[in-house]
Amino acid sequence: MSPNTPLVLVILDGWGCGDRVEGNAIAQADTPNWNRYRSVWPRTVLKCSGEDVGLPPGQMGNSEVGHLNLGAGRIVYQDLTRITRAVRDGSFFENAVLRTSIEASRRNGHALHLMGLLSDGGVHSHISHLFALLELAGRLDQRSVYVHAFLDGRDVPPANALEYVEALEDKLKTLGYGAVASVIGRYYAMDRDRRWERTARAYRAMVYGEGLRASSARQAVEKGYERGETDEFIQPTVIVRDGRPVAQVRDGDALVFFNFRPDRARQITRSFTDAEFGGFERGPAPAFPDFVCLTQYDRTIVAPVAFGPQELTNTLGNVLSRHGLRQLRLAETEKYAHVTFFFNGGVEQRDPGEDRLLIPSPKVPTYDLKPEMSAREVTDAFLANIEKYDIIIMNYANPDMVGHTGDLSAAIKAVETVDECLGRVVEAVLARGGTVLVSGDHGNAEHMCDAEGCPLTAHTCNPVPLLIIGEAVAGRSLRPGSLQDVAPTILDLLGLPKPPEMTGTSLLS
């Protein structure tokens, strides 16, 4: 391949394969380009959940996991799997970083705070990891333990928080220590798009006790529902006892963030760890607790990490760079980390010959208000740069991000926008004799309501499609596979040898 005959990988985020038409934004959308490509060019389906991508059996995939496996060309055992195994085999309770922090807080008379997403969605966190931390605190005789519960509503049903709150309260009652100190929708606590005003509200609730008030976590959720908020959007609420906050994060306290996925953990982490911080005004007495990251959120975050990163070598980006190929990574803000950091195996540093282009996502509260997102701008940027690169890896965020809103009509519009943009990409590549691979990373937009018609905002375990478009594959057939097989297929198309670390195999028959 050369810039005159480029190879392009287009990742359709959240575009899964579903049999039902009801609640299926992809099936209901008008997609003339997609339909034509499927009828003409080689296609197959790829497994993208559970053990096929390094997750526990039956666990739905997600964008982070999908891009890791796509770029690595092998099954990458995910942090969820690693940490859950550590809990089961007991090594979690011997983790030196966790023990050091908890023991120091007890020894110095300070509290232990545990913050993170209260959910079993398995995308950003798992409630079982929180329970393990609570048990570890007891083993180390730390009884001043406070939970700051971020509510999900995206990776699990949108109004399911009471189930998790009840499970947490039952656990605390069984243990005989600990309390919930705040309840905050992930919209505020886990923003990743530099909407610092959201992060600020979460921070001030935890540090200053500012925000709405409730006498219990259950009441905080119920009051949110009364205001018409689903779990994700429940406003930061401080739990009070006798009119005073149950607990606030103070200097010298220990604060363990039990989310394992980095992208939505970084902003709130930096508000606690960065000495020089410009995201928002932290107030007259910012807290600098003994902060622990469950996994590495960013190499530049100065805080100990309980479960360090896996080192992945010979990823697709490494191989392309070593063979002197110029590559572009292109996405809008919401998925930029996925085509860069995650696709490169959890490494921020770019390879020689790798350029990156970030297109800002629109500034709207939720993407059902603008289902087109920045797809057309991403496409314009692609067309402006197609002559410069041998390989372009790009992402369309719409099916996933709009799918998460649960608004079927908006998701249909999102899918139609992507189909329009995909047509422009394919036309430009074919005009230059190149090849386009179109792949999903996980399901979402193909299953947006349950049998009763209630909205579903979470990912699915459905497989995703893979199409290969170009004269180089005319008349060829593709075998079924999984996401790990995409990178070896790209190397096969380029005539490059597959490194031994890649356990996936080419899908070309």
From Swiss-Prot:
Mn(2+) 1 binds at residues 400, 404, 459. The active site is at 63 (phosphoserine intermediate). GO terms for cellular component: cytosol. It catalyses: (2R)-2-phosphoglycerate = (2R)-3-phosphoglycerate. InterPro entries: Alkaline_phosphatase_core_sf, BPG-indep_PGM_N, Metalloenzyme, PGAM_B_sf, Pgm_bpd_ind. Its EC number is 5.4.2.12. It is an enzyme of class 5 (isomerase). Transmembrane segments: none annotated. The keyword Metal-binding applies. One of its GO terms (biological process) is glucose catabolic process. GO terms for molecular function: manganese ion binding; phosphoglycerate mutase activity. Mn(2+) 2 binds at residues 13, 63, 441-442. Substrate binds at residues 124, 154-155, 186, 192, 261-264, 335. Its cofactor is Mn(2+). Pathway: Carbohydrate degradation; glycolysis; pyruvate from D-glyceraldehyde 3-phosphate: step 3/5. Binds 2 manganese ions per subunit. It comes from the Bacteria. Keywords: Glycolysis, Isomerase, Manganese, Metal-binding. It holds the Pfam family Metalloenzyme. Catalyzes the interconversion of 2-phosphoglycerate and 3-phosphoglycerate. Monomer. Belongs to the BPG-independent phosphoglycerate mutase family. NCBIfam families: pgm_bpd_ind. This is 2,3-bisphosphoglycerate-independent phosphoglycerate mutase. The lineage of its organism: Bacteria, Bacillati, Bacillota, Clostridia, Thermoanaerobacterales.
